[in-house]
Amino acid sequence: MWNVQVVLTSIFVIFCGIVFRLVALNVKDPFIDEIFHLRQCQTYCALRFDIWDHKITTPPGLYILGMVYAEVVKRITFTSESLVSVCENMNVLRSANLFGGLVVLPLIVQGLVEKEKPQFWTVNIVAMPLLFTYYFLFYTDIWASILIVASLALVVRQPLGLITSSYISGIIAFASLWFRQTNIIWIAFIASLLVDKRRREHHNDMGFVQNGINFIRQAVKDWVAVLPFISNIILFAIFVKYNEGITFGDKENHKLNLHIVQVFYCFTFMSMFTWPVWLSIRLIKRYIHFTILGNYGLNTIFTIGSGILIKFIIDNYTVVHPFLLADNRHYTFYIWKRILNREYSNIFMIPIYHFCTWNIIDSLSHNIGGLTPITIITFIGGIFITIIPSPLFEPRYYIVPLLIYRLYVRPTKEKVFGISISRHALEFFWFMMVDVAITVIFLCYEFTWFSEPGKIQRIVW
């Protein structure tokens, strides 16, 4: 099986190299948010740290990284060009994300693979379609995700012992906040993983309430190990108060809303991308039992009530941001226009949202050796707190939840409707099919706006 992974990994790396080259040849102008990111990084490369573009919503982590990365490239290529000149080549800066995705991320997640029965293939984590697109653009998402996964891995494996691993994890977690502010929620989740791991080491599993009490006691007992994460939360609270909000700039377009339906969007994306992991006849039977047959049919009443609640949320807590309606360079524009904004969509989406919500929670709770009930609650709670306040329907916000979900959910052993195929291999081919499709659309489907004549537009997540 290892040889299969080597072959498939080689195929994916070669594919990424080809795509990067094609993007470099065809996307010669900064694309969407790259306009701000590239310009700000180039400003930092000129050592003008006093200049800041107030349209940028995230901290300067990407620009500091880009500046350092460009300096490293300059030195290892022995170029006589200045740092400013190197940074003016936007493909050099773009390659920082490709390096992160193909080198750094695999090294981190490989340490989380269980040797006897691997719960995932490293190449599949790297090939996730929501990540894949941004390996070739200068966006914050890749390194924001890498640093959170690195922080998580240190807490889970503790290669340097409890205290040292926790403090390094906390430092890396702090660095992740310089790329995306909402990572503060995932820092709290990582802290819950640490405490729960310690709880299981020192206490037998008992009832949920007693486990919760033991969790709190363990957090107090291990306060020294938890301190780096508490410090991050305190520092972030100070930042929010001083900054008068979470976003750095463009605050008018990023006001907080109660966008509860975003949870259903997230769970639907997560279920769609991970179907090779969970889809089985046994799961379908379990869902039917949960919705209709369970408790002598009483579950039917609960299901009807859930459906009514979902419709209420759709009708009252769907936020339609002006960007969603105006920007046809994102898949969400077409998802909204052709699916979610159709007549009766608030009816036919109910069973989809119901199933996807149940599926995510069910697959987490049925994974032996995965998350415990306590950390499932902190994970789901993290998703809620991260995405519900956001007015934007933005799949990039689902990257970290999807990564964590996939790191912990083990593929079912059941055949795919009677067909004998490795679930990991099926997942790889599914991801590759999606990656190829979004690459073809991105490179081949070109259009222009009347407001920007001659400037080629493309479609991404």
Swiss-Prot record:
Molecular function terms, GO-annotated: dolichyl pyrophosphate Glc2Man9GlcNAc2 alpha-1,2-glucosyltransferase activity
Pathway linked to the protein: Protein modification; protein glycosylation
InterPro entries: Alg10
Coiled-coil ranges (or none): none
One cellular component term from this protein's GO annotations in UniProt: endoplasmic reticulum membrane
UniProt entry keywords in alphabetical sequence: Endoplasmic reticulum, Glycoprotein, Glycosyltransferase, Membrane, Transferase, Transmembrane, Transmembrane helix
Subcellular compartments: Endoplasmic reticulum membrane
GO BP annotations listed: dolichol-linked oligosaccharide biosynthetic process
Transmembrane intervals: 6-26, 92-112, 119-137, 138-156, 159-179, 220-240, 260-280, 290-310, 344-364, 368-388, 425-445
EC numbers for this chain: 2.4.1.256
Enzyme class: transferase
Catalytic activity, as annotated: an alpha-D-Glc-(1->3)-alpha-D-Glc-(1->3)-alpha-D-Man-(1->2)-alpha-D-Man-(1->2)-alpha-D-Man-(1->3)-[alpha-D-Man-(1->2)-alpha-D-Man-(1->3)-[alpha-D-Man-(1->2)-alpha-D-Man-(1->6)]-alpha-D-Man-(1->6)]-beta-D-Man-(1->4)-beta-D-GlcNAc-(1->4)-alpha-D-GlcNAc-diphospho-di-trans,poly-cis-dolichol + a di-trans,poly-cis-dolichyl beta-D-glucosyl phosphate = a alpha-D-Glc-(1->2)-alpha-D-Glc-(1->3)-alpha-D-Glc-(1->3)-alpha-D-Man-(1->2)-alpha-D-Man-(1->2)-alpha-D-Man-(1->3)-[alpha-D-Man-(1->2)-alpha-D-Man-(1->3)-[alpha-D-Man-(1->2)-alpha-D-Man-(1->6)]-alpha-D-Man-(1->6)]-beta-D-Man-(1->4)-beta-D-GlcNAc-(1->4)-alpha-D-GlcNAc-diphospho-di-trans,poly-cis-dolichol + a di-trans,poly-cis-dolichyl phosphate + H(+)
Membrane topology according to the record: Multi-pass membrane protein
Positions glycosylated per UniProt: N316
Biological role: Dol-P-Glc:Glc(2)Man(9)GlcNAc(2)-PP-Dol alpha-1,2-glucosyltransferase that operates in the biosynthetic pathway of dolichol-linked oligosaccharides, the glycan precursors employed in protein asparagine (N)-glycosylation. The assembly of dolichol-linked oligosaccharides begins on the cytosolic side of the endoplasmic reticulum membrane and finishes in its lumen. The sequential addition of sugars to dolichol pyrophosphate produces dolichol-linked oligosaccharides containing fourteen sugars, including two GlcNAcs, nine mannoses and three glucoses.
Family: Belongs to the ALG10 glucosyltransferase family.
Protein name listed in UniProt: Dol-P-Glc:Glc(2)Man(9)GlcNAc(2)-PP-Dol alpha-1,2-glucosyltransferase
